[in-house]
Amino acid sequence: MSLTNEQIIEAIASKSVSEIVELITAMEEKFGVSAAAAAVAVAAGPAEAAEEKTEFDVILADAGANKVAVIKAVRGATGLGLKEAKDLVESAPAALKEGISKGEAEALKKELEEAGAKVEIK
């Protein structure tokens, strides 16, 4: 009689941690493989996902009614000149800053929203 995958999973789930370690060791010996290589590959996946979440882009979605205040806020945040900041604000939606920390992105969003802009963090 052949066991289904579900039956195998249930049997493993009912084992203690030490019994599972013994099972893994026995499987490594029987099949001549190492579970360490698989663990390294699995560990690399979540690290990349976490790395992506540490950098954020601040997007100016709309300048709103008070463009002058938004232009001043953009100049202060980006260090752009008056003409460059004005062009950026008028070309909304546009990326203001890319690859910044969450705290910096939130602070920039708050500053621009207080000036009347609509801002997105991606």
From Swiss-Prot:
MF terms in GO: mRNA binding; structural constituent of ribosome
Name under which the protein is recorded: Large ribosomal subunit protein bL12
Lineage: Bacteria, Pseudomonadati, Pseudomonadota, Gammaproteobacteria, Pasteurellales
GO cellular component terms attached to this protein's record: cytosolic large ribosomal subunit
InterPro entries: Ribosomal_bL12, Ribosomal_bL12_C, Ribosomal_bL12_C/ClpS-like, Ribosomal_bL12_oligo, Ribosomal_bL12_oligo_N_sf
Record's subunit section: Homodimer. Part of the ribosomal stalk of the 50S ribosomal subunit. Forms a multimeric L10(L12)X complex, where L10 forms an elongated spine to which 2 to 4 L12 dimers bind in a sequential fashion. Binds GTP-bound translation factors.
Keywords, comma-separated and alphabetical: Ribonucleoprotein, Ribosomal protein
Function per UniProt: Forms part of the ribosomal stalk which helps the ribosome interact with GTP-bound translation factors. Is thus essential for accurate translation.
GO biological processes: translation
Domain of life (superkingdom): Bacteria
Annotated PANTHER family: 39S RIBOSOMAL PROTEIN L12, LARGE RIBOSOMAL SUBUNIT PROTEIN BL12M
Pfam short name (any one): Ribosomal_L12
Keyword Disulfide bond set for record: no
